[in-house]
Design a protein with these regions (language model features):
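Alpha-helical transmembrane segments and their helix-helix packing motifs
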Residues: 1-157
């Protein structure tokens, strides 16, 4: 924004950094929250939102996975409890899996921040050996930001 002062931490060195921070979040350095932590959170939430937006579109277009209940105009929580009754082990396994991912990513984030040897969002998972470029990093940030807005719209609709 032309009338706002550009924050000192947003110097354009990160993908998607255009110096826009009207709330001054990039200047926070208390309680373990710094620019590294904020970028890690933005990437994580963007990735989850991209998956969520795709999942919503999939269910709307093709219906639920075989063996799982259909919403049929009911609230999604009613559908969740129906699924819980039919597939409690699958849901518990999903919760355990998500917990493990959160623990692993939390340790990686904390260690990467302390050592400086790990870029935010980099878990070393690249089985197809894609070349990581600045262009791809920018696309991931932009698509993640758009997906976060899209999921909010899908939930609100």
């Amino acid at each position: 924004m032309p009338f706002l002062e550009q924050p000192k931490n947003l110097d354009g060195s990160m993908a998607g950094d255009v110096g826009f921070d009207p709330l001054g979040l990039s200047e926070i350095d208390d309680l373990g929250i710094d620019l590294y932590w904020l970028r890690e959170a933005e990437l994580k939430h963007g990735r989850v939102a991209m998956l969520a937006a795709t999942g919503v579109i999939w269910v709307e277009g093709f219906g639920p996975l075989p063996g799982w209940p259909e919403a049929d105009g009911r609230s999604q929580m009613d559908v969740f409890w129906d699924a819980w009754e039919e597939h409690p082990n699958a849901i518990c396994a999903g919760i355990v899996f998500i917990t493990a991912i959160e623990l692993i990513s939390g340790v990686a984030t904390t260690m990467g921040r302390k050592t400086g040897e790990r870029a935010p969002g980099d878990f070393g998972l690249n089985p197809l050996q894609f070349e990581i470029t600045e262009e791809l990093a920018l696309k991931e940030i932009k698509h993640g930001r758009l997906a976060m807005w899209a999921v909010m719209g899908q939930i609100g609709a």
